[in-house]
Amino acid sequence: MALDIVEYLKEREIAESHLRAQNQPFITLSRETGCHSRIVGEMLQQEIFRLTGKKWHIVSKETILDAAKGLQLNLQQVKQVLDAQNKGNIEEIILAFGDGRYRSYQKVRNILKKIISEIAVEGHCIIIGRAGAIITAGLPAGVHIRLTAPLPWRVQSISKQLSITAKEAAAYITKTDEKRLKLFQDFSGKELETAFFDLIINNQRVSDEETVEIIIHFLQQKNRL
């Protein structure tokens, strides 16, 4: 009987530890192409540190590639999955006969979902893009933000960022938005809906500073800081 009690207490401690882990706060930042997700993410990081003394880390495509490299995944294949590219004939041949680091695209997606989920469970991070909102939807401590703006504003933004013409910027936005939508669908099997997000902010009408202020206030109201 005593042994049963000890085992019970151990199991309870493990369960409570798991629950605490799931309650570590984190943010996902989704965006339409041309919106200032990286800028907002870095400003949020600085403001959270100023207010709490805690350094939240930014999770970008590069972060996930580093984690994938540590797991000895084929980085070319990982990049193709993250960029929502379809595998071609060469990849099919490699999958069948070649590089042992190649896995099925579904397996790679599952591994990447696990990487992102585990990062989110650790908490105190800002996940930029990568279908973060849907991948982490089951974690209660997440706050999911989407930045949006009218197309003309985004064209101007991208044109300035990349030093390209408005026509080139419009084509770039169309292509990138399509890739991001496909990535979301690949990871979730669902269409992108506003219901996945806690806050949707118009990046044209709301400045980056105001956006950070709104998100910080929301985090405080939800006891996430």
PLM features per residue range, with description:
Residues G129-A133:
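Short, polar loop motifs at secondary-structure junctions
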